[in-house]
């Protein structure tokens, strides 16, 4: 799927939305260490019995290390913000003149290295928030990259999220919490078929195969893994594929592996890196949240051809 030709909505109303507050634990860490230091002053001993300065420093260093070890044993999920709103706004302004697809790819790349969201529902859904950038699954990465790319401010990105993440439209309570996440897009195929996330380009990528659908879909079109690999081998490069920056790749699960009728098993975002003016000198990458629910992983940037070769899916849309 591609958002080629999509333009930023100019009539979006400004929305006053307070981004989630930082966790108190985030600010508590230095306080904890400081109290440890103050609670262990250098003992007032006589000159004959006073510890040498180097030994006292070593003892204090070990005490601090022990304190931090205990802290992280009890609070192993402490995380740091992805980007503060000031940096988000600055980057939005910096890339505002680029095509929307390129902006999507650049924002997706910003998430590379972000821990995978192991929450089965998605942490953003469980917490009923729009912004939860500390962790990402493939759906959240797709949502957020588009929202940030199509907006000029963090607040505007939230407004776009209310329009795009939901089958109808998202609603926020007075406390900034989402009231109707049950109305969100939960299936990749629903996103694709809605037409609200761009134009489908499946038939432009290669030979189309039909497989059994589900949830009201009789048949579903895709380019099979085998045909895609043949195209990659025959051209000796993925550069011949009609892919552009910001294109979404929806990976199709085998019918027998579906658990709740899902057709799409994963989503990734294309990023093109041009080595020269020649089309043959461009490299195609896939940015995706690689992980397993209840286990972990991270957002990765990998060669498109390498991912296709090793992926557990039967095709793409």
Identify the residue ranges that each predicted region occupies:
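A cross-taxon signal for low-complexity, glycine/charged-rich
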Residues: 8-14, 20-25, 34-37, 41, ...
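N-terminal capping segments
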Residues: 80-218, 259-260
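A mid-sequence, solvent-exposed acidic-amphipathic segment
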Residues: 209-258
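Catalytic nucleophile-His microenvironment captured as a short glycine-rich beta-strand/loop
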Residues: 248, 261-274, 282-288
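A mature extracytoplasmic/lumenal domain signature
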Residues: 253-255, 288-291
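C-terminal regions of proteins
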Residues: 290-317
């Amino acid at each position: 799927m591609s958002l080629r030709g999509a333009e930023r909505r100019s009539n979006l109303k400004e929305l006053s939305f307070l981004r989630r507050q930082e966790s108190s634990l985030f600010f508590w860490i230095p306080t904890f260490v400081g109290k440890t230091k103050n609670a262990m002053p250098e003992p007032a001993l006589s000159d004959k019995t006073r510890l040498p300065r180097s030994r006292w420093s070593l003892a204090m260093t070990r005490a601090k290390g022990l304190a931090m070890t205990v802290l992280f044993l009890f609070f192993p999920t402490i995380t740091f913000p992805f980007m503060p709103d000031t940096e988000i706004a600055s980057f939005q302004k910096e890339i505002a003149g680029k095509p929307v697809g390129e902006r999507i790819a650049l924002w997706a790349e910003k998430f590379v290295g972000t821990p995978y969201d192991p929450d089965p529902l998605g942490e953003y859904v469980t917490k009923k928030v729009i912004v939860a950038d500390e962790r990402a699954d493939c759906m959240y990465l797709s949502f957020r990259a588009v929202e940030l790319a199509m907006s000029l401010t963090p607040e505007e990105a939230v407004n776009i999220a209310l329009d795009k993440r939901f089958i109808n439209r998202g609603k926020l309570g007075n406390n900034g919490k989402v009231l109707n996440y049950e109305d969100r897009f939960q299936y990749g195929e629903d996103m694709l078929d809605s037409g609200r996330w761009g134009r489908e380009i499946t038939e432009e990528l290669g030979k189309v195969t039909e497989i059994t659908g589900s949830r009201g879909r009789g048949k579903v079109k895709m380019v099979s893994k085998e045909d895609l690999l043949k195209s990659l081998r025959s051209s000796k490069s993925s550069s011949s594929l009609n892919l552009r920056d910001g294109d979404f790749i929806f990976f199709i699960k085998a019918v027998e592996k579906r658990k709740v009728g899902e057709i799409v098993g994963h989503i990734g975002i294309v990023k093109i890196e041009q080595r020269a003016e020649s089309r043959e000198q461009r490299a195609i990458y896939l940015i995706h949240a690689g992980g397993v629910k209840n286990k972990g992983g991270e957002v990765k940037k990998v060669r498109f051809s390498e991912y296709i070769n090793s992926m557990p899916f039967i095709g793409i849309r």
